[in-house]
Amino acid sequence: MASTFNPRECKLTKQEGNSYGFFLRIEKDTDGHLVRVIEKGSPAEKAGLQDGDRVLRINGVFVDKEEHMQVVDLVRKSGNSVTLLVLDGDSYEKAMKKQVDLKALGQSQEPSLNDKKAPSVMNGGAQMWMQPRLCYLVKEGGSYGFSLKTVQGKNGVYMTDIKPQGVAMKAGVLADDHLIEVNGENVEDASHEEVVEKVKKSGSRVTFLLVDKETDKHHSEQKIKVKRETASLKLLPCQPRVVEMKKGSNGYGFYLRESPEQKGQIIKDIDPKSPAEKAGLKNNDLVVAVNGKSVESLDHDSVVEMIRKGGDQTSLLVVDKETDNIYKLAGFSPFFYYQSQELPNGSVKEVPAPTPAPLEVSSPETTEEVGDHKPKLCRLARGEDGYGFHLNAVRGQPGSFVKEVQKGGPADLAGLEDEDVIIEVNGVNMLDESYEKVVDRIQSSGKTVTLLVCGKKAYDYFQAKKIPIVSSMADPLDDDPDPDEGRLEGSEQNSHMAEERERAHSTASHSSSNSEDTEM
């Protein structure tokens, strides 16, 4: 049954700061995540997206049954490149009626020559992997957020059912990844049952060495064996640190000691304001290398002598306990970090540890700093006297804002406040539109209207930081109410004039409030 439906793979690439040129939305009484309002000449149009398409997969992850904002989030976090598997509207509706397994659609498609450089999600960005990569997963809620599968005609075990925003996805695991190692042990020739057992025995944390679908195909065609020494460590949440120090009048300002609990040489008793403290050395750091040479197998006196031979400056490769535990679990020496970073022996280049992907951030711009400055979505149902607020604008300036919110009126009950700046009306950005157009859009809406607004302080903050204000930053609205429930007859719009501004008594709304509409 599934073979009669032909989904399309569309690869979209945009410039930094620009959009993909389409809206992703859900509509009342309509199934699926819909593609709408495709801009002419946009990346969306060039990639072949069509109005009414339903998005089945994003970067290989099946999303048809996921919450809409999670789907929007996946697109946003893909950076400047995203791959969508879509099905045209008519086919989608027929498939739903025939109860076709949408998850199976497109899975047998082999990538074309043009697909060789398809981008893959990596911690919210886009990156093409041509080398194996190491991923570290820690269970959340008793789950890693993936399943394992075997593929007919191919050896090995592969990753599937990657849960959107789950542990595996955040760790950098991709759909159809070939699993090479589990906790440093090669599993290329292991059975499905053996691999499952190894993962279970690992407990609440596990490391995988993986190759993506394209890389795996390349290795298979060229009969190249995957080499663990070529692995990328970039996805690990903790990394070794290269620390450079210049000796002060009282030396470096730390003690080097052997630990009965941990094999190797441990940093202890760092003096305040010493070269060691200023360089970022921490108590209980384990010394892996001195001036580019591994000291993991050396005794205490030998390591001390190597530091002394460095003269008035030294470069240490160190790991904290968490980093050491991750590398040990994966069966890698932290010294491998030198090769992976292409640092020459003896390098004193300071390499900052990468920051793990944010867990609950809805778009790349919404950081913790923005937390107190988020916009809000307000859904207003027209009352007997309209919406209960006035819309104002300063002459000669773009943008409209809220004034005179009537206590107990629809606007007040929806959370609208004086000085709130209107960002969107029913999903359409109105920031650069004239006052008249904003008024007209509200008036032509119907019985309810959904506004994305931003308080003056928050608006000024976003403008200063040049952060675009989008609906995914706001808390989601509850399910739509019945627009006819409790409806009162509306009054005619009442316009007023003030010396410095125009304002209009707001009325009306539109059935578009029965959708979530996000510009991509």
Curated annotation (Swiss-Prot):
GO terms for biological process: positive regulation of protein targeting to membrane; protein localization to plasma membrane; regulation of monoatomic anion transport. It is found in: Membrane; Cell membrane. InterPro entries: NHER, PDZ, PDZ_sf. This is Na(+)/H(+) exchange regulatory cofactor NHE-RF3. Residues 506-520 have a biased composition (Low complexity). Gene3D superfamilies: 2.30.42.10. Residues 352-373, 472-520 are annotated as: Disordered. A scaffold protein that connects plasma membrane proteins and regulatory components, regulating their surface expression in epithelial cells apical domains. May be involved in the coordination of a diverse range of regulatory processes for ion transport and second messenger cascades. In complex with NHERF1, may cluster proteins that are functionally dependent in a mutual fashion and modulate the trafficking and the activity of the associated membrane proteins. May play a role in the cellular mechanisms associated with multidrug resistance through its interaction with ABCC2 and PDZK1IP1. It holds the Pfam family PDZ. The modification Phosphoserine is found at S108, S147, S191, S249, S333, S347, S491, S509, S511, S512, S513, S515. The PDZ 2 and 3 domains seem to be involved in the interaction with SLC26A3. Interaction with the C-terminus of CFTR could be mediated through independent binding of PDZ 1, 3 and 4 domains. SMART domains: PDZ (SM00228). It comes from Bos taurus.
